[in-house]
Amino acid sequence: ESLYKMLGGHVEALSFTAAASSHAVLGKPLKDLQLRKGLLVAAIVRDEHTIIPGGMTTIEDGDHVVVVTRATGLDDLTDILA
């Protein structure tokens, strides 16, 4: 996990690696996930390819997921859920 604070600490960009413990988000289209308010899945890196996700994009085991959020306290990929 990596954390970057931006805009005077009002916004954070975080990077997570999807694993089996993230089963609540794996394989489901982003449009079907109940994401936290004020959170954006900005990019997914899969097999060295960067994906700018859309609603039909899924998060798969081993993906590196970059999220941008106003929320704090996100420690695990499943914390992106509302």
How would you label these PLM feature ranges?
Residues 1-18:
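Long, charged amphipathic helices and adjacent flexible linkers at domain junctions
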Residues 15-82:
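Cytosolic Rossmann-like ligand/nucleotide-binding regulatory domains
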